Curated annotation (Swiss-Prot):
WD repeats lie at residues 507-546, 549-589, 591-628, 631-668, 671-708, 748-780. Induction: Down-regulated by growth on bacteria. Its EC number is 2.7.11.7. It is an enzyme of class 2 (transferase). This is Myosin heavy chain kinase C. Autophosphorylated in vitro.
Amino acid sequence: MEEKKTGAAAALALLNQKFPVADVIAGTKCERAIKWELTIGDDLKPKWTHSIVCVSIEKTPFAKGSCRTAHKLKDWSQPDQGLVGKFSTNKKTTRDSYFTDVLMQTFCAKWAEKFNEAKPPKPITFLPSYVYELIDHPPPYPVCGGEPFIEGDYKKHNNNSGYVSSDARNTPQSFSHFSYELSNHELLIVDIQGVNDFYTDPQIHTKSGEGFGEGNLGETGFHKFLQTHKCNPVCDFLKLKPINQSKKALLRGTLPVVQLMDFHDAIGLNGNGSGPKNNYDMNYFRNGGGAQQPISLDDEEKMLQEQLERIRAQQQQKSKPSPPLVKQPSGNNLHKQQSPSSPTSKPVPQIVKTPSQSNVVNKSPVSPPKENSNVKLEQDNINNNNSSISSNNDNSNNNNNNNDNINNSSNSSSVNSNSSSVSSSSSSSSSSSSSSTTNAAPISIQVSRNSPPPQQPIQPSSAAASASSTSSSNVPTPESTSTSSMEQTPDRSEFEKWDLTSIKNIDTVRGLQSECITGDSLRLYSGSNDGQIGVWDAVELKHVTNIKAHGKSIRAVIKRPGFDQNILTAGADSLVKEWDINTQQTIKEIKESNEVNTIFIQDNLLYTGCNDKTVKVWDMRSYECVKTLSGHTRAIKSVCAMGNLLFSGSNDQQIYVWNLATGTILTNFQGHEGWVKTLYAHNNMLYSGSHDETIRIWDLKTTRCVNTIKCKDRVETLHVTNQGIFAGSGDWLQVFSHDKYENLASLNTRSSILCLWRNQNQLFTGSLASNLKVWSWDKM
């Protein structure tokens, strides 16, 4: 019983961090994978889709063939279905060949539908197939095929060189004959194998011999089949022409040929027998011919959280009865979730004192610039009139945090006498709600989708004034003249008029995958998933060089204000580094306790958000951690600051607003139904983007959500100007007006946008597709 609880706890812990290689849940090794699926709609155009899943693969194969090994595979996005993972034993097998196999099997499934419409004695099915890229391994990532596991005797009925099984059944042979006749002798489907009439791993021969992999033998394959095939009663039943008689135009079959040939055109197969329009090596999809080629890895983890919760749910069911889990909303069930009638309690953010010089490694001595004001931060006790906060213990059922309230202790007092009191409302499971005004403390706001409850305003200036007037508090505040990493380039958008409806792609710069980006008028700097910093010429629009910076993926990169040649990077290797770009050398290095997802600089303060659920405040003069802000229940994905306020967004769907003078929480913004991936503060407004496919706009004067913008996909990154809102929403670059929030433009970039950076009227978008796209628009 104790072991099962441990397994469930391990699964819960993994919800708050990137899923690492070879973690063990209930005795099973698990890892992340990109899952690629091919679908064919009624328009007969193939379309690739992908998601990140959690998989468990048995090391020892349960079957071996001449070309591949078969392993039991568990995909936690389909926890009730057993799968087979197929790995090629040929070292020369390419990544594209796995996608070609999936295309052939999906293509044959379309032919099987037509075969079944003819009402044969036994219908047939080609198993759905997938491609899994195991992304927790060093590049190039291992790849395997996947399909459902079917119990029974596996048999090969024929192959691509004319072989026919001695106990050949009628149905598989007639299907090969059917494909040959119904395509007007343009193609032939062979290598029929599987369990009963569930088929897999087919091969397609085309008349020209082009496309569909190296197994396509062209007319040689036709000849071998014709030599060995013997028509059977199913062939007669389907009224197929006897095999060795010439037939060119007239088909006696009962199925329409035109629709199938339209499908051939959709994938590039010419009806005149000239074969595929492109030699099928996935370039067809890469060039946009009917579908999007899976050319990039998407580091987003849309379904991982839900899958890991399934793991935990299984373990809880085995151990003891437990209340049903409320699943993390995903892109499939947005706006359908119902809030629980009785919200559970949740820990209140607390300050954890962590003075630490030991985790800072000095690479080379650097003299900080002289400042008039002393901003050295000291670790001190919070003033006695600060709030005292009590938090309930977290439990394994605390999964849905949308309506969790923060419990305040009865002996709470006001943060400071000058701060405005804010009402905290809590709703009971019956109907009536009561609100009480306390001077105490952190508040929890219930933000409804349509009508947020009124709150008293947050006043950054008041908080700053109170901090300066409170002599007993030694916690410094940001300087009055604030310089942040969000505002380094002078912004002309306040003075110019832009026509954002005219936005267009003006260039694509090849070079490096980009998860994050920053820059200035001369250079751009991007961070990639292989730990390299990409340096780009922002004027000539070309890739300059790469710098090996981290052992794992770089999650954030920003310029240090006031230091033209210094940038900071943060990575999945738990390191934050400051670099001199001229020398390409590390100046300082911070070792965090967990993966660092986001960093932000304001004045001489560095804020880091990590997978350990905390936000840390660092003095950049001494690189000491002067404050740790705790309270989120899952990984921090975004932080930003404005004046004396700090904002943090998390996988727990919450946005916390912190008072930097005291390190206490002023309020938490609720309403998102997915991970909060990006925050942007602009003109006393906070813009938040989430995996629930929405952007929410929060008025910091009233603490209300004043608008919710529905996007096309999960929102990964935002950039806000005086004239427009730019959002990276899946594969889409979307632009919204700043005043009415109207959708001005939506452009498909064919690769998920992970980062944005703007220089005047040029926008740069980065993805994992090894390029930067450059966008521009007209001035009015």
